[in-house]
Each structure stands twice: as C-alpha cells, then as structure tokens.
Amino acid sequence: MRLTPTTSDTEVSGLEKKNLGRITQIIGPVLDVVFSPGKMPNIYNALIVQGRDTVGQEINVTCEVQQLLGNNRVRAVAMSATDGLKRGMDVIDTGAPLSVPVGGATLGRIFNVLGEPIDNLGPVDTGTTSPIHRSAPAFIQLDTKLSIFETGIKVVDLLAPYRRGGKIGLFGGAGVGKTVLIMELINNIAKAHGGVSVFGGVGERTREGNDLYMEMKESGVINEKNIAESKVALVYGQMNEPPGARMRVGLTALTMAEYFRDVNEQDVLLFIDNIFRFVQAGSEVSALLGRMPSAVGYQPTLGTEMGTLQERITSTKEGSITSIQAVYVPADDLTDPAPATTFAHLDATTVLSRGLASKGIYPAVDPLDSTSTMLQPRIVGEEHYETAQRVKQTLQRYKELQDIIAILGLDELSEEDRLTVARARKIERFLSQPFFVAEVFTGSPGKYVGLAETIRGFKLILSGELDSLPEQAFYLVGNIDEATAKAANL
C-alpha cells in the first residue's frame, strides 16, 4: 500500500523518522531542498513542507521532486502557493509519488490536484489510492475496434465523426466556443452514456468550473441527495493555481479515469479543458527549473510531456477511455508548437473558426479544416462518406468563388456556379444548430440530431429538392423537417 501525502499525525511522525530535508532556496513555486547524504528522494517523489509562517499560520505545502542537483540537493515544484515558506524549514520525503483517491467514491465530488475534496462535503469514503505517474498500457493490451461515437451535433457527426475510445481535439482561439462545445458534448454524451465521466479543468476560468458543477447538479449527472449515484468526478486546477498544480491536474484526472477503465472495466469519458494550459504550465516550470527554452519559448521537453500524458489515454481490452480535449490556439495560429504537437496524437480534430463565429454560425466548426480518421467508407458506410465528400466539395467550390463574388458580384457567375453558391450557403447555415447548454443565451431550445437524420437532410439539400427555400430557413434548426416548416412561416 502506497503512502498517500495526507497529514494525519501518525503518518507524519512515521514519515519524520523516514527522511527529513531542509529548504535552501525558494524561487516562486520552485524549491531547492537539501537531504542527508545517501537519503536522496527519487524523481517524482512527493515532499511535504510543514511549519508556521511569520504570522503563526499553519503551512502545509506538497511538492514534487523534478531534478537531482548533486551535493545532496533536489529541486522540487510546489503544488500550492509557496507564501510563508522560509529557508531552513523542514521537508518530509513521503517516499512515493503523489497518490490520489480512485474508485466509485470519487463520483459526484470535486478534487484538487492532490486528490483532496474541495466541495465541503467531507472526506472521500475510499481507502484505494493510485499514484499519478505510471506507464502507458503495453501494445498487447490495446484494443483496435473501430466504431462511431454519435454526438447529436450535425457538423461533427457528418464531417469529422468521433471514434469510440478515441482521442478528440477541439481547436480554437479565444472566445470561439470551445468550452460551450465541450459542455454540449458533456450534455449529449454523458447523459445518454451509461458509463462514468471524469472532467479535468486544467488552467481554465473558475467561473466556468462552477457553472459546470451547478449545471451537472441540475441535470442529475451529479446526484446531490445520493452522491453514490452520480456519474462524474471533477478535478480542478484552475487559472489562479501555481504552475505545478496546472501541470499535474491532468494526470490526477487521468489516474481516476484509468481506474474505472482497468479495475472496474468500464467505458469512460475523459474531458480535459484545456490541454494548452498543461503545456503552458510545463513551460513556466521548465524556465524556473533552468532549462533552455525551445521554439517560441516552449519547454524543450514539450513532445515528451505531451506524449507521456496522451499515450495513457487509450482503450484496452478491459475498457475504453474516450477523451475530448479543448485546445486553445494562441493567436489563431495552428502551427504554434503547442497545438501542432497535440495534432499528432488525435483521431479526430474539430477546428473552430473565428470567421464562422463572426457570421453568427454556431457551433463555429470549420467544415473544411476539421478532420477524422473515421471518415472512410469501410467504417461509416458509402452513403455517409459520399454525402460528406459532396458537402465538402460544395463548400470548397464556394470558398474558391468568394474572391470573384467580392470583385464582380454574384451575377457574373455561370448558372451552375450560382446554384453551387446557393446550396453552399444553405449547407453552411444548416451546419449550425441550437445547443441545449446555450438555451439561456439564444432563447431557442436545444436540438439533438441523429446521424441518419443528418445524412438525410444534407442529401436533400445537395439533390436540389430544397433549392426554392430561402437560406434563412436553414439557420439554427435541428433536422431538415424543421427547416421546411420554418420556411413556410417566413
């Protein structure tokens, strides 16, 4: 049984006999600690700093060993604020990596990076803990089944379908709707999905974390009266936390998800918002640890850090983890090292476009930039594949014609091109959809559209049967029948 870095007196007294060090230097969230010769802690061991600050307030800071410096010194990164720490304070080596509670008792609760509950509902009722650092499953354990994960969102299901047990990235700059899309996916999938979900809030707004918690309580995904019946565990390390916490909170959430997959043999949904903040925190820590920065100031170990996290998010013969990750794109530049490194690990990418958002088309998913390894006729079937390709061709032709339209106007186009433009504009509007989680803002009730309905709708537009309808009829509706009904009222 691994020792968990909690602070009951009996444990601490046992630990004190074990291995004691002393703080020699503090630079922001990074501490240098000196130990007795031959008593050096291992890399990733958890250290606990205890004592009182100058005002007499009790201090209890957990750190993680990152470097062994020689001369019996180690460099560690703090998981909480280092206010009040002084040189010479005692540091206890727990002898093990950070361990967090796992299992059914975590459902319905909110945790911080250390696995401590932060929802004022008392301690977690579990004796099972698991270290946050572990290796990825071996090749032989991996599962290679291919099946589609229906989301009820037209643009996603048709053009960049998600794989069950796959990794999905939502890419977008600031304010184009990544978090709203993640909330909608939680709403559509987590409610209909029989298994459990784990949500990792990595370096995002505390307000959004609070909104999500309240929403989950209202929808019954978290059952307040009987916590054991809840379907989701929440792990938060938000924007105000030190970089150490933001760098490790993704691993805490993943460790909880892995337990449900490996031990309970369940299908798990893992939501991470936002994976870019994990990279950003790693970059802050890397500079403080004295590493030479790499491209655009990122850490030189960017690829390794991302790979270590992503390779653990996978499906085995026991169960699956389907992960949906929001990826912030700095300055809308998809070639930035952070989003570019993330791309390599994903089965499907949903790219959000500022251009579409400014047109008022929500979800602002770029139909030509979004990709999926699942969009193959042998997986999705001929009808789906053909429809998706024809939709993309129509939109691509419209994109090519936009310069001509801007200079010469629509009237200068050939009859065929004018028809293509009209259909493309209808398709563009029909790809929008009212969301359940945005009802309070838009006033229109949310819509879930099944895959068969989605394909039928786009086939009708492409066939020309709906050429007589005005394009406004296709804006923010669910299935195609709603569009024809709306046209009758226009």
UniProtKB/Swiss-Prot annotation:
Binding-site residues for ATP, renumbered to this chain: 172-179
GO cellular component terms, A-Z: chloroplast thylakoid membrane; mitochondrion; proton-transporting ATP synthase complex
Reactions this protein catalyses: ATP + H2O + 4 H(+)(in) = ADP + phosphate + 5 H(+)(out)
Disulfide-linked positions: none
Superkingdom assignment: Eukaryota
Keywords for the protein's UniProt record, in alphabetical order: ATP synthesis, ATP-binding, CF(1), Chloroplast, Hydrogen ion transport, Ion transport, Membrane, Nucleotide-binding, Plastid, Thylakoid, Translocase, Transport
Signal peptide per UniProt: none
InterPro entries, per the entry: AAA+_ATPase (IPR003593), ATP-synt_VA_C (IPR055190), ATP_synth_F1_bsu (IPR005722), ATPase_a/bsu_AS (IPR020003), ATPase_alpha/beta_chains (IPR050053), ATPase_F1/V1/A1_a/bsu_N (IPR004100), ATPase_F1/V1/A1_a/bsu_N_sf (IPR036121), ATPase_F1/V1/A1_a/bsu_nucl-bd (IPR000194)
Any one GO MF annotation of this record: proton-transporting ATP synthase activity, rotational mechanism
Free-text function comment from the UniProt entry: Produces ATP from ADP in the presence of a proton gradient across the membrane. The catalytic sites are hosted primarily by the beta subunits.
Name of this protein: ATP synthase subunit beta, chloroplastic
Organism: Medicago sativa (Alfalfa)
